[in-house]
Structures are given as structure tokens and as C-alpha cells.
Regions:
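Short, surface-exposed helix-loop/turn micro-motifs enriched in polar/charged residues
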Residues: 94-97, 131, 195-199, 221
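ATP-dependent adenylation/nucleotidyltransferase module used to activate substrates
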Residues: 1-143, 148, 178-186
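Alpha-helical structural motif
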Residues: 4, 8, 73, 176, ...
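Short, structured secondary-structure boundary patches
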Residues: 48, 107-116, 149-154, 206-223
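A short, charged, Gly/Pro-tolerant segment at domain boundaries
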Residues: 202, 220-232
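Catalytic subdomain that performs nucleotidyl-dependent activation
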Residues: 136-216
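Residue-level detector of flexible, active-site-proximal loop/helix-junction positions
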Residues: 65-67, 95-97, 159, 175, ...
Length: 232
């Protein structure tokens, strides 16, 4: 096992234990976008499912938005899941912009993706949905919420949903993006080339630059930010 793999696995295991993400009897549905983070999440949870305790079942779902002009490499995702012993479900969804012209395409797309994912999970006996957000995602979201919303909040490692009998888990919560990127390169993950033409990235990209600047000022900045949210 390579050094980056070891670091990711160690932090993945620590996150699962510290935040009680995996319990005996869990049926977990992974939201597989096709990016490096969700691919690594499939690989790690597939390995974890082969361990006797806790006994968990893991499958994945990839959602295609029928009215958005982009497409991922579906055959690669199917092959990747098969190689890891994970069943992949291909789900279709769409949205009608005219239903609420005040909402952006990105909001409507994300809302409908999640609704499709949640309903499929409930109807097929899953009790948890695993998302591929890592520590960098969580801390950049924190900075965005502080800067633009005046809210000291961010995504949680574990979040029970109010309107569905489901819990959202983020097993990569303690994993650094740089380590996932290194694993993706070493294991030759195929990068998805077709990007959504409507993707809104400017604000998040700006906050990522702020986060990187904070780490240059203080190499321990990420841990200080993390403690400010999760260890108060």
C-alpha cells in the first residue's frame, strides 16, 4: 500500500469511528458522481464491507439529469463498481425551471438529485447515504457560510434527515483532498471530462483560495478551523 493510500485509509477509519458512521446492519447507498472523491469513497467502503464487523451492505447510485447537456463516462463507473464488488444503480431525474424562476439551475438540479437519491434509498431499504465530501470541502463551506451568511456552520460528518428515515454520512470528513488526489493519480482513476455548463464555481473557488492562503499563513489552520466547529 502506498503512503497516500495509508494516510487516506487511516483518516477514513478514524472518521468512521469518531463520528460513529458505520453500525452493524447498515445498508449504505453511495452517491457516485464520478469524481475522484466519490470513486475513492466507493473503494474504501467496498473494502470496509468485506470486514466481518460491523456488518454493512454497500451499493452505489449515479444520477443522470436528463435535461442537462453533459454526461459522465457511465461504462467506466459501472466497471469501477464491478471491480470493487459494488452494485451500481443508474437513476434518471430532471427539473422544470418554470416551477420557480427565482431558483437557479444549480439549486434546482441539486434539489432534484437529492430528492431522487433519497426516494430511491427509502424505497430500496437503505438507511444511510454516503457522500464524498472531505475535510477541505467542509472547511471551505464553513468559510463561505461565515463570509456570506454570517453563520458559523458547515456540513456535518453525520446528519439524520428530518423528512426521510435516512442519515447522511460523510466518511471522508477527516481526509485531506491532496491525499485523495494523490491516490487518484497513483491508482489511475479516470477523470470525468464532461462538465456541467451551468456549474457555479466562482464563490467556492474564491473561498478555496482563501483557505489555501490561511494554510500558507499557518500550516495548522485547517485543524484550528475544524476545532472551532466540532470541538466546542
Amino acid at each position: 500500500m502506498m503512503k497516500a493510500e495509508q494516510k487516506v485509509l487511516k483518516r477514513f477509519n478514524k472518521g468512521c469511528v469518531d463520528y460513529h458512521l458505520l453500525e452493524d446492519g447498515d445498508r449504505i447507498l453511495i452517491a457516485l458522481s464520478g469524481g475522484k472523491d466519490s470513486l475513492e469513497l466507493v473503494r474504501l467502503l467496498a473494502q470496509r464491507a468485506r470486514i466481518y464487523k460491523p456488518h454493512i451492505e454497500v451499493e452505489a447510485a449515479h444520477i443522470i439529469m436528463d435535461n442537462i447537456p453533459y454526461e459522465t463516462d457511465r461504462s467506466y463507473l459501472q466497471d469501477f463498481c464491478a471491480e470493487n464488488g459494488i452494485k451500481l444503480h443508474i437513476l434518471h431525474s430532471s427539473f422544470d425551471e418554470s416551477t420557480d424562476p427565482r431558483k437557479t439551475r444549480c439549486f434546482l438540479c441539486a434539489w432534484n438529485r437529492r430528492k431522487t437519491l433519497f426516494e430511491f434509498a427509502v424505497n430500496n431499504g437503505f438507511n444511510k447515504i454516503a457522500l464524498g465530501h472531505h475535510m477541505d470541502d467542509i472547511l471551505v463551506t464553513l468559510l463561505m457560510n461565515i463570509t456570506f451568511e454570517g453563520s458559523h456552520s458547515t456540513m456535518q460528518p453525520s446528519l439524520p434527515l428530518k423528512h426521510y428515515p435516512l442519515t447522511i454520512i460523510r466518511p471522508l470528513s477527516l481526509v485531506h483532498e491532496a491525499d485523495i488526489r494523490q491516490v487518484a493519480e497513483e491508482l489511475h482513476f479516470t477523470k470525468q471530462k464532461a462538465l456541467c455548463p451551468y456549474e457555479e464555481t466562482t464563490r467556492r473557488a474564491d473561498m478555496q483560495a482563501v483557505f489555501q492562503h490561511l494554510e500558507r499563513l499557518n500550516p495548522e489552520a485547517r485543524y484550528s478551523l475544524w476545532r472551532s466547529v466540532f470541538m466546542v
